[in-house]
Amino acid sequence: MSVIASISTALPAYKHSQPDLGEFMAEFHADSEQKKRKLKIMYSKSGISSRYSVIPDYSSGKEERVFFPKTHNLQPFPSIEYRMQYFNKAALPLCIEAIEKCIKEKVLSSQITHLISVSCTGLSAPGLDIDIVQFLKLNPAINRTSINFMGCYAAIHALKQADYICKCEPGAIVLVVCVELCTIHFQKIDDLDNIVANMLFADGAAAALVVPGDIASKNNFKGFGIKKFHSQIELNGKRDMTWQLSSTGFLMSLSSYIPQLIEKGIKNLFKDSMKGLEIETADITHWAIHPGGRKILEVIQKELELGSADLESSYRVLKNYGNMSSPTVLFVLKDIWDNKVQANRKELTYGVAFGPGLTMESIILENV
């Protein structure tokens, strides 16, 4: 059994309250006082108190902006080239912070055999993976995999690849790092999908160290043992969550039907995930549900007949950080490990995240 031996997270410097973000968005999404009031009500009911960004502009005055133009209408609006330049500058420090905390007192950087980098908010070649190798002086012969444009479920997919590697290559030490700078892709498009996306998404990074079971035992690493993965695509939701390139950045489509699609599919996903394991809902101690939004957590809680305490970590991450896309489920797993897990007990954790497709990706973990 492969083991997630360590999880660490990192946040950018600028913390914005949800009301401050709502004020900023209202300036560009609402052309009347009535629309501004409606938008602020949406923000107040989002379940989010604060979000982090690599950009200070969302709670600063017009003259203090550093990313957007100091104009009343943000023109000339940032191009995709400018946004990618900003990503390349700001993403690496977050990755390094998360990685250094993750591997500290676990392994030396020179011992890492595989690097899996994850992002859907920045792309370039040579890319983030090579920047990490260079900065940390990793072995130039390290095996590298980049997982791009999968969205919020990509961390679980990356853990799946790490698990495959550990099972196939004795001695493998796999580092997974996810970083998303969602806030550099703010768009002024005045439609509900875009308004909801701007209300939810934030910036952050997370790293996970995955090793084969024998290495974990030899080094007395405690962590999450990986039991199983299961993925399911709800093709009737293919157009309800999309992420596409444009001349002014990445465009998010996030329809209001997503909670309904998840509500209809989550029971079957859970049932199929448990096949061959003889596990029931009552056997799961901890629930690492990706907090894609308050409504998503509510429908999952209802459909799986969970108590509010079962999703405590998911709600806490949503409240304090918002939806950071791929790193978010790792934030939830870290919160569970730090605050809820009793490491000496054989507790089970069920994790699930959602993304374009509509894809639902799940993972079953056991304390080791």
What are the functions of these language-model segments?
Residues 1-86, 173, 186-264, 268, ...:
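Condensing-enzyme catalytic core mediating Claisen C-C bond formation in acyl metabolism
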Residues 42, 46-138, 281-297:
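Conserved beta-ketoacyl condensing-enzyme motif
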Residues 48, 90-104, 161, 205, ...:
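Short, well-ordered amphipathic alpha-helical segments that serve as non-catalytic structural scaffolds
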Residues 78, 110-114, 136-148, 188-193, ...:
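Glycine/charged-rich beta-loop-alpha catalytic/anionic-binding loops adjacent to active sites
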Residues 98-112, 218, 267-285, 304, ...:
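Phosphate/pyrophosphate-binding loops at sites that engage ATP/ADP/AMP, CoA/4′-phosphopantetheine
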Residues 120-121, 139-141, 146-167, 263, ...:
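Claisen-condensing/thiolase-fold acyl-transfer catalytic domains that form or cleave C-C bonds
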Residues 123-138, 176-187, 238-243, 297-311:
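Acidic-glycine-rich active-site phosphate/pyrophosphate-binding loop
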Residues 140-142, 147, 157-161, 178-198, ...:
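Active-site glycine-rich loop that binds ribose-phosphate moieties when present
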